[in-house]
């Protein structure tokens, strides 16, 4: 192969590599942002579940509140 052809191919590979490095960095930033957002959402969900449990009375009566069964 000619030197100019090799130089052209090398330049093309370097260009592709640079583009891929930028893409990988962008994807890494996106994944990191999503992980942070998911952690926040998990915490919000945990707090909502706690509030829901605290505000909703149980529909199951305790044993002391239950009427005794009829005797046959």
Swiss-Prot record:
Family matches, as InterPro entries: SlyX
Top-level taxon of origin: Bacteria
Pfam families linked: SlyX
Family of this protein: Belongs to the SlyX family.
Name listed for the protein in its UniProt record: Protein SlyX
Species the sequence originates in: Klebsiella pneumoniae subsp. pneumoniae (strain ATCC 700721 / MGH 78578)
């Amino acid at each position: 192969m000619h030197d100019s052809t090799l130089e052209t191919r090398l330049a093309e590979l370097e260009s592709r590599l640079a583009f891929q490095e930028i893409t990988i960095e962008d994807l890494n930033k996106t994944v990191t942002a999503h992980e942070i957002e998911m952690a926040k959402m998990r915490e919000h969900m945990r707090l909502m579940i706690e509030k829901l449990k605290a505000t909703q009375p149980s529909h199951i009566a305790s044993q002391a509140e239950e009427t005794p069964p009829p005797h046959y």
